[in-house]
């Protein structure tokens, strides 16, 4: 899986950076967890402040487009983001559940 950043924009009102990216991959569309971890590594960012909002597969290609947001602090993240997006982006709970099995 390879991620290429298409655009980066800082939103001063919401105190976050907004990224549009392309994911080139083999096989099925990568999970939010996989994309979030890879994107956090590329951006050298705290994975807890990074939100991957959407990943949309391009028809007939091994490529997907995505949109992610990197917040300056956790307070702003919790104030702005919707609950279902936060649940979709939780990695700690998911990892703990997998280890407990």
Curated annotation (Swiss-Prot):
Keyword Ribonucleoprotein assigned: yes
- One family name in Pfam for this protein: Ribosomal_S24e
Q: Which family does it belong to?
A: Belongs to the eukaryotic ribosomal protein eS24 family.
Give the originating organism: Methanocaldococcus jannaschii (strain ATCC 43067 / DSM 2661 / JAL-1 / JCM 10045 / NBRC 100440)
- Does the record carry Acetylation as a key word? no
Q: Which UniProt keywords apply?
A: Ribonucleoprotein, Ribosomal protein
InterPro entries cross-referenced by the UniProt entry: Nucleotide-bd_a/b_plait_sf (IPR012677), Ribosomal_eS24 (IPR001976), Ribosomal_eS24_CS (IPR018098), Ribosomal_uL23/eL15/eS24_sf (IPR012678)
**HAMAP family tied to this protein:** Ribosomal_eS24
Q: Which GO terms describe its biological process?
A: translation
Q: Name one GO cellular component term.
A: ribonucleoprotein complex
One GO molecular function term of this record is:
structural constituent of ribosome
Q: Taxonomically, which superkingdom?
A: Archaea
State the protein's name: Small ribosomal subunit protein eS24
